[in-house]
Curated annotation (Swiss-Prot):
Major location (coarse): cytoplasm
Free-text tissue specificity from the UniProt record: Expressed in roots, stems, flowers, pollen mother cells and embryos.
Keyword Cell division found: yes
Protein name (record): Kinesin-like protein KIN-7B
PROSITE patterns per the UniProt record, alphabetical: KINESIN_MOTOR_1, KINESIN_MOTOR_2
Keyword terms, alphabetized: ATP-binding, Cell cycle, Cell division, Coiled coil, Cytoplasm, Cytoskeleton, Microtubule, Motor protein, Nucleotide-binding
Organism classification: Eukaryota, Viridiplantae, Streptophyta, Embryophyta, Tracheophyta
Quaternary organization: Interacts with ANP3. Interacts with TIO/FU.
Gene3D superfamilies: Kinesin motor domain (3.40.850.10)
Gene Ontology terms for molecular function: ATP binding; microtubule binding; microtubule motor activity
InterPro entries for this protein: Kinesin-like_fam, Kinesin_motor_CS, Kinesin_motor_dom, Kinesin_motor_dom_sf, NACK_C, P-loop_NTPase
Biological role stated in the UniProt entry: Probable plus end-directed motor protein that functions in the NACK-PQR (ANP3-MKK6-MPK4) MAP kinase signaling pathway, which is essential for somatic cell cytokinesis, especially for the cell-plate formation and its expansion. May regulate the activity and the localization of ANP3, probably by association through the non-catalytic region of the kinase. Functionally redundant with NACK1 and essential to promote the progression of cytokinesis and for cellularization (formation of the cell plate) during microgametogenesis and megagametogenesis.
This protein's record includes keyword Coiled coil: yes
């Protein structure tokens, strides 16, 4: 004999242990099985078709006659084919539920289905099997004694009738606070044996109301309930538990029917209406219970059937439902309703517990002992407990003191580390101002952020990274984030600066050449060298002439740019400036030698006026003191030259001398007195000293200016070389060659994690800056974590970061300075976002079907009744930046509304925001960042 099958584990949700005098509570869903009968003789006579099939023992499929429609599948705990016997149906799902009544748990088994589907036939076989198994279990369990009682009733036209004693007439239903709903004056017979029980069940079947219809010769016209009350107890009483008591309900429901199929009239029509009404109430109760909403009202009292079975529907009982169906195509609608009822019943949860009967005397004694124990503990607390409490308090105090000492030590270490960090930062600042100036200039030139505003990598903790690692990360980020087009543009700009420096050097040489040729400063050889050098620099400028308009190529012209840079003589200008330096040194030395010759003294005597002055040389002063010079004239002068310039300021250096001074000199020379000769010699010495100081200052200023030009050219050359290295490394990354930084960083950085972090930050900044939701959808749907998306993610993040900072600065600025601009910026952006949502709301009806709209309204908690449901639905999109599922669903819905999903062509990421916008839908708010730029007047 087969053992009793167990309930599937999926049906049992939670189980609580036994209490000393309590019961075991088990939450379990209703067990639902489906039995399909074969075609009967009426259906064969009509040549009816079979519309259902069972591919496996848990699935039933509707074979739709229309081949265009997909078959409909239903899944249950167990499905029985027409060839299965009733014993298999019982053992497959009902046996375990029925035998649980022997262990003290209430149980209910009932059959549900349309008329003539085989309910009564199935329940007769199940009842016989239940009686057989009960007495078999009693025979095997000798240590317990069992007492069985049986009662039977039927509900006919909403009237309760006792099947064991029909003379009692209609019975009333009463509510008992402990037992629930009971039937007044219902006869309950004590079962003496198995044959006695079978005899009583046969009496109930004979007393039941049966009638003939067009679909069934013996159609049940009432609901029949046979109740077995099982009382079991141990033969040797142990503990306070004396016995178990449970009820087993065997319910044979009347079948639902349609009047046009049964051809019912008169009494049969009245019976059918009562049957359908009670079954409708049962279906409503099942659906209310399966919804899971505890606040919903469950209409148990609308029908006497549901009122009697209330304990079995969501209450203290285990329940098994056998749904019987017909395979005929003519009954397909009724079959679908039966399966729909079964699907709802699968979700109903019962809370079954073991019903234990406790002896009142023993229970009272047990409780008195427990109370006495508690009172004794309250009166005289044990000393051991107080000792334990004291030791526990001492232990806690020691732990607190230990933690305080650890906190002090940690604070001391933190202060030491902070002081060391401050010292290191100050040393780096001093060192960076002197030695790292070229690198900082390159960083400023490239305009790439290398501070904390860049996105940190979560793969390596910042506390463990050294300064060298951070420098490597910064270089790596600048290389990977640098666009080749931007690098080429920066190289061209550096060449433009080099051209300007060449022009300034040309001006310096031109001025030196003019002074040498016009005033004979130095020898003829030096003048020729200066002229030759000037012509060479001009030739070099002609060969390296750049157009005013910088043409920026794409990534494919990088090799041509590198070849052009390598073919150029980058250090040519530096060499020319070195020649200028040598020439100036030679001029200084020649000036010092010529100063000692008699010809020089004679020349000075003949020339009474200075040929030129520092204050009256506008070209030289503009060159030395111009804004392009790194050093000003006052910074290069020594104290002596300042005195000379101050003394020579009131002297006039015109083309003709003043007549008063000339006449005075002639008078003094004619008189020939020693006083006039002495004054003349003093004037000549003073003039010689002024001339010498002025010439030395001019040469010194030019020399310092040329030195500054050399330094700037060296810096520009360093910047160009660094940019070329960046271009080369970008090309190496394209061809797949991994450099040292790539090998170290790729092992430390996990791009998918970094992508998710960046996308979360971007979504939050979208929300804070009131960015267009269509722009958000475009970006979210296009960039999904590909390694090539890194540059786009960084650009978007920098845009949004700048926009947030810009709006914050406008918000913190003085209203007197800005007027209404901050409010207008935010108001314009919010107004544009509102217009965008209104536009999307207009497209809901055209882009979404009616069923899809209703499903979305239900999913997004849009009230079923109300105005502007479309606008309410759109206003809920893109409102929660912290919920990634909300963001993803919002993006999918907006993509459907705007038509991103309709286009079959592949969208290139380089054409972002150009391919998505259709010509007919070009609005100001659909221009993405262009609208933001116009809004901020950028």
């Amino acid at each position: 004999m087969m053992g009793p099958p167990r309930t599937p584990l999926s049906k049992i949700d939670k189980s609580n242990p036994y209490t000393p005098c309590g019961s075991k509570v088990t939450e379990e869903k209703i067990l639902v099985t489906v039995r399909m009968r074969p075609l009967n003789w009426r259906e064969h006579a009509k040549y009816d078709l079979i519309a259902w099939e069972c591919p496996d023992d848990e699935t039933i499929v509707f074979k739709n006659p229309n081949p265009d429609k997909a078959p409909t599948k239903y899944s249950f705990d167990k499905v029985f084919e027409p060839t299965c016997a009733t014993q298999e149906v019982y053992e497959g799902g009902s046996r375990d539920v029925a035998l649980s009544a022997l262990a003290g748990t209430n149980a209910t088994i009932f059959a549900y289905g349309q008329t003539s589907s085989g309910k009564t036939f199935t329940m007769r076989g199940v009842t016989e099997s239940v009686v057989k198994d009960i007495y078999e279990h009693i025979r095997k369990t000798q240590e317990r004694s069992f007492v069985l009682k049986v009662s039977a009733l039927e509900i006919y036209n909403e009237t309760v009738v006792d099947l064991l004693n029909r003379d009692t007439g209609p019975l009333r239903l009463l509510d008992d606070p402990e037992k629930g709903t009971i039937v007044e004056n219902l006869v309950e017979e004590v079962v003496e044996s198995r044959q006695h029980l079978q005899h009583l069940i046969s009496i109930c079947e004979d007393q039941r109301q049966v009638g003939e219809t067009a679909l069934n010769d013996k159609s049940s016209r009432s609901h029949q309930i046979i109740r077995l009350t099982i009382h079991s107890s141990l033969r040797e009483i142990a503990g306070c538990v004396q016995s178990f008591m449970a009820t087993l309900n065997l319910v044979d429901l009347a079948g639902s029917e349609r009047a046009f199929q049964t051809n019912a009239d008169g009494l049969r029509l009245k019976e059918g209406s009562h049957i359908n009404r009670s079954l409708l109430t049962l279906t409503t109760v099942i659906r209310k219970l399966s919804s899971g909403r505890k606040r919903d009202h469950v209409p148990y009292r609308d029908s006497k059937l549901t009122r009697i079975l209330q304990n079995s529907l969501g209450g203290n009982a285990r329940t098994a439902i056998i749904c019987t169906i017909s395979p005929a195509l003519s009954h397909v609608e009724q079959t679908k309703k039966t399966l729909s009822f079964a699907m709802s019943a699968k979700e109903v949860t019962n809370c079954a517990k073991v019903n234990m009967v406790v002896s009142e005397k023993k229970l009272l004694k047990h409780l008195q002992q427990k109370v006495a124990k508690l009172e004794s503990e309250l009166r005289s607390p044990e000393p051991s407990s107080s000792t334990c409490l004291k030791s526990l308090l001492i232990e806690k105090e020691m732990k607190i003191q230990q933690m305080e000492s650890e906190m002090k030590e940690l604070k001391r270490q933190r202060d030491i580390a902070q002081s060391e960090l401050d010292l290191e930062r100050k040393a780096k600042e001093r060192k960076g101002s002197s030695e790292c100036e070229p690198f900082s200039q390159v960083a400023r030139c490239l305009s790439y952020h290398t501070k904390e505003e860049s996105i940190p990598s979560k793969s390596v903790p910042s506390s463990r990274r050294t300064a060298r690692d951070r420098r490597k990360d910064n270089v790596r980020q600048s290389l990977t984030s640098a666009d080749p087009t931007a690098l080429v543009q920066e190289i061209r700009l550096l060449e433009k600066h080099q051209k300007k420096l060449g022009e300034e050097a040309n001006q310096a040489l031109d001025l030196i050449h003019k002074e040498v040729t016009s005033h004979k400063l130095g020898d003829q050889q030096a003048a020729e060298k200066v002229a030759k050098m000037l012509s060479e620099i001009r030739d070099m400028q002609k060969s390296n002439l750049l157009t005013e308009e910088i043409v920026v190529g794409d990534k494919a012209n990088l090799k041509e740019e590198i070849n052009r840079l390598n073919s150029q003589e980058i250090a040519a200008l530096e060499k020319k400036l070195e020649c200028v330096q040598n020439t100036i040194d030679m001029l200084v030395s020649s000036f010092q030698t010529d100063e000692q010759t008699p010809d020089f003294r004679t020349q000075v005597k003949k020339k009474r006026l200075l040929p030129f002055g520092l204050s009256n040389s506008p070209n030289l002063q503009h060159m030395i003191r111009g804004p392009c010079s790194p050093l000003s004239g006052t910074e290069n002068k020594d104290p002596e030259s300042n005195v000379v310039s101050a003394n020579s300021a009131p002297v006039s250096f015109g083309a003709t001398p003043p007549k008063r001074d000339d006449n005075r000199c002639r008078t003094q020379s004619r008189e020939g007195t020693p006083v006039s000769r002495q004054a003349n010699s003093v004037d000549i010495k003073r003039m010689n000293r002024m001339y010498k100081n002025a010439a030395e200052e001019n040469i010194r200023n030019i020399k310092s200016y040329v030195t500054g030009l050399k330094e700037r050219v060296a810096k520009l050359q360093y910047q160009k070389q660094l940019l070329v290295c960046q271009v080369l490394e970008l090309e190496a990354n394209e061809t797949g060659a991994a450099s040292e930084y790539d090998a170290t960083d790729e092992s430390q950085m996990d791009w998918p994690l970094c992508f998710e972090e960046q996308r979360k930050q971007i979504i939050m900044l979208w929300h804070l800056c009131h960015i267009s939701i269509i722009h958000r959808t475009q970006f979210y749907m296009l960039f999904k974590g590909d390694p090539a998306d890194q540059i786009y993610m960084e650009v978007e993040l920098r845009r949004l970061t700048w926009l947030e900072q810009h709006l914050a600065e406008l918000g913190n600025a003085s209203p007197a300075l800005l007027g209404d601009e901050p409010a207008s910026y935010v108001a314009s952006s919010i107004r544009a976002l509102k217009q965008e949502r209104e536009y999307l709301a207009k497209r809901v009806n055209t882009k979404l079907g009616a069923e899809e709209r209703e499903m979305l309204y239900l999913k997004w908690d849009v009230p079923p009744v109300g105005k502007q449901r479309r606008q309410q639905f759109i206003n809920k999109l893109w409102t929660d930046p912290h919920n990634m599922q909300h963001v993803r669903e919002s993006a999918e819905i907006v993509a459907k509304l705007v038509g991103f999903c309709d286009s079959g062509e592949t969208i290139r990421k380089e054409m972002f925001e150009l391919n998505f916008a259709s010509p007919s839908d070009k609005k100001t708010w659909m221009m993405g960042w262009n609208f933001i730029s116009n809004l901020l007047h950028l």
